[in-house]
Swiss-Prot record:
EC number: 5.4.3.8
Species in which this protein is naturally found: Parasynechococcus marenigrum (strain WH8102)
One Pfam entry name: Aminotran_3
Taxonomic classification: Bacteria, Bacillati, Cyanobacteriota, Cyanophyceae, Synechococcales
N6-(pyridoxal phosphate)lysine modified-residue sites: 267
GO biological process, one term: protoporphyrinogen IX biosynthetic process
Keywords, comma-separated and alphabetical: Chlorophyll biosynthesis, Cytoplasm, Isomerase, Porphyrin biosynthesis, Pyridoxal phosphate
GO molecular function annotation: glutamate-1-semialdehyde 2,1-aminomutase activity; pyridoxal phosphate binding; transaminase activity
Group of enzyme by EC: isomerase
GO cellular component: cytoplasm
Protein name listed in UniProt: Glutamate-1-semialdehyde 2,1-aminomutase
Family: Belongs to the class-III pyridoxal-phosphate-dependent aminotransferase family. HemL subfamily.
Gene3D superfamilies assigned: Aspartate Aminotransferase, domain 1 (3.90.1150.10), Type I PLP-dependent aspartate aminotransferase-like (Major domain) (3.40.640.10)
Amino acid sequence: MNTSRSQAIFGAAQGLMPGGVSSPVRAFKSVGGQPIVFDRVKGPYAWDVDGNKYIDYIGSWGPAICGHAHPEVISALQEAIEKGTSFGAPCALENTLAEMVIDAVPSVEMVRFVNSGTEACMAVLRLMRAFTGRDKVIKFEGCYHGHADMFLVKAGSGVATLGLPDSPGVPRSTTANTLTAPYNDLEAVKALFAENPDAIAGVILEPIVGNAGFIQPEPGFLEGLRELTKEHGALLVFDEVMTGFRISYGGAQAHFGVTPDLTTMGKVIGGGLPVGAYGGRADIMGMVAPAGPMYQAGTLSGNPLAMTAGIKTLELLKQPGSYEKLTATTEKLIAGIKEAATAAGLPFTGGSVSAMFGFFLCEGPVRNFEDAKATDSERFGKLHRAMLERGVYLAPSAFEAGFTSLAHSEADIEATVNAFRESFAEVA
């Protein structure tokens, strides 16, 4: 496979941008080799600057649930852009998307649009503290809530419970109020509440962990968190930036039947354009300026292009049969991957929920980030390169979930499973 143009462009980029990329995972550091530079995307496919075609299971890290460059989304954007790219003032499209989100997501009575998942999580943390008058927050090892200082506490390490920062430039004082617990461990959460009486503003988590691979909540875990937070006067926050509108139209909270107090969103609700949102109970959201005293603002928040793409994407997802198709596609894919790994004699555990999937090259079960670290990352790197050679683009990390879309066909899944068979045999 010729990637000479990708290599040349990435080589030049390294002198222009730190590491040659605008987001670290794109640099392929954890899988080896040089990153692929894309030229265009359409449906379930991506083409690089050398003309190589890939079946894509990243989907722009989640937003492309209808497939890349869906013609109805593109048409709506072409019409919208003629009216301007950003107003810096209210637009009616905000109302439309807000109503769609409120109608779909059980916890959301009011919503505020921002420009990224990180922004949404930053704002919701401030809101949790403002509403409760408390400073401490519990997060879980392996759960990612953006790159804001207060969430950059190293997951799964010996210092995690001490609230020490995971990046230079983050003062210890900033993360001192960030408490961590292993995912799926209710007893650890109970202990943190006992050790910090009347001091914890809330608990935030990915209801399905997608930034430590793919880890599902065990039966009773989410329900237990709901009970604990109510008992201690704390708020429960679901970070649904990844799961929102992906595993069901109402997100993970609708799928699992557990309603948090607040929810953060992103990715799908922008249809591939930069977007984020947070929402929840009306009494809590009433704290947000200008209705209340908790300040948060954004130059491009609620811009007409992101709103347009989000509206059209949600309209497409609401069509009958959308999530049934996504579920069938993903289940067929993960079953095929498992069969291929077993045939090659490799340890494997994996699963899926609707249009989200993941696997580990280790024996299961994987309940938390500590379990996930048992995966064979070196072998995954070899697997990733082997799959690229066979025209399949997976997330360039052993600790990221994968995504399917409405555009993936049965033929795409069959071709992907065949590529896994050959690649697993190669790396076994």
